[in-house]
Amino acid sequence: MKPPFQEALGIIQQLKQHGYDAYFVGGAVRDLLLGRPIGDVDIATSALPEDVMAIFPKTIDVGSKHGTVVVVHKGKAYEVTTFKTDGDYEDYRRPESVTFVRSLEEDLKRRDFTMNAIAMDEYGTIIDPFGGREAIRRRIIRTVGEAEKRFREDALRMMRAVRFVSELGFALAPDTEQAIVQNAPLLAHISVERMTMEMEKLLGGPFAARALPLLAETGLNAYLPGLAGKEKQLRLAAAYRWPWLAAREERWALLCHALGVQESRPFLRAWKLPNKVVDEAGAILTALADIPRPEAWTNEQLFSAGLERALSVETVRAAFTGAPPGPWHEKLRRRFASLPIKTKGELAVNGKDVIEWVGKPAGPWVKEALDAIWRAVVNGEVENEKERIYAWLMERNRTREKNC
């Protein structure tokens, strides 16, 4: 048994000692069968939430009404959820109620896809009542039971299906894909925040180039912020090297580029992304527009962007041109290292010095003067030494006065 399961085994053993059934379930079991890195380990049990909280000394009630308790075991947190069935769903988003049951199979039956409806006992024996292992072997994503019913219960499952295409490289089962096409309008009931979580995982998947065209083919794009009418662009995005991107702002910048978004800020805000992501993606796009080729960076542009942003710009450019970014990254690193200063804080002078030298009250002119100074230093027009900058600034001011 793999270490992540061994570390949680004590929880299952204690539940069993108290007379309850308990199994590993969900994505961790799926990823074990796929040979992928195992993430969070979840446990399903016949014990009621209050039983779980009575058995374990350290628990956190994160949703006992819906059956889930976090058990802290050997310093790690594990979600332990009571076997349950879902009642009727409201607004295509969540069940109105849940019913706790004693059957593992009944619990697995409510899950979204067969590959996620697999359990494993304490000895490593796989319990697979819905053909999840066969779906994994065939590399297909298929719903548990009737696809239309699953998607009408929670419309976000349609986005999850396409997200799993991106993460795993699987294909949608024909009946599953057809049900998404038929029920795509239900996505309008889902909050932007939930859609954004799935979209970010989709963009970060190693097979994003397969998943993005699927948004167009299934019609889901019509109900996603800013993607309506972008079928052609989403299909063309299949040619981009999405796995080359490591940062979320790079992925959103490339999506804007792929879609031909003219104003990135309204588009990104519609996804309710953090301001930092909106600003950084916008800055990357602005640099791409201002700097048409990797070799076109000026010293001023490189200094203003900073090394990390400059590397991101060239990573995004590489993703849509197909030229590996490594050589240009190395050149930019060398160029940045050769700059006499790397930040404005490294200037040998400050605003107080400039005011004292010029003898004028503080005002907007001080920033203009400091900007002129750092540009001159970065371009090698003056050394970053106080006396030399003083002489350069005085000469600049005399020249400007003559020309007035």
Swiss-Prot record:
Stored SUPFAM superfamilies: Nucleotidyltransferase, Poly A polymerase C-terminal region-like
Keyword Cytoplasm: no
Residues that bind CTP: G27, R30, R111, D154, R157, R160, R163
A molecular function (GO) term: magnesium ion binding
Catalytic reaction annotation: a tRNA precursor + 2 CTP + ATP = a tRNA with a 3' CCA end + 3 diphosphate; a tRNA with a 3' CCA end + 2 CTP + ATP = a tRNA with a 3' CCACCA end + 3 diphosphate
InterPro entries recorded: Bact_CCA-adding_enz_type3_sf, CCA-adding_enz_C, CCA-adding_enz_firmicutes, NT_sf, PolA_pol_head_dom, PolyA_RNA-bd
CDD domains noted in UniProt: NT_ClassII-CCAase
Residue numbers marked as site, Involved in nucleotide selection: E153
CC cofactor: Mg(2+)
Residues at the site labelled May assist in discriminating ATP from CTP: D112
Function of the protein: Catalyzes the addition and repair of the essential 3'-terminal CCA sequence in tRNAs without using a nucleic acid template. Adds these three nucleotides in the order of C, C, and A to the tRNA nucleotide-73, using CTP and ATP as substrates and producing inorganic pyrophosphate. tRNA 3'-terminal CCA addition is required both for tRNA processing and repair. Also involved in tRNA surveillance by mediating tandem CCA addition to generate a CCACCA at the 3' terminus of unstable tRNAs. While stable tRNAs receive only 3'-terminal CCA, unstable tRNAs are marked with CCACCA and rapidly degraded.
PANTHER family named among the record's database cross-references: CCA TRNA NUCLEOTIDYLTRANSFERASE 1, MITOCHONDRIAL
Note: A single active site specifically recognizes both ATP and CTP and is responsible for their addition.
Family: Belongs to the tRNA nucleotidyltransferase/poly(A) polymerase family. Bacterial CCA-adding enzyme type 3 subfamily.
Name recorded for this polypeptide: CCA-adding enzyme
Organism: Geobacillus stearothermophilus (Bacillus stearothermophilus)
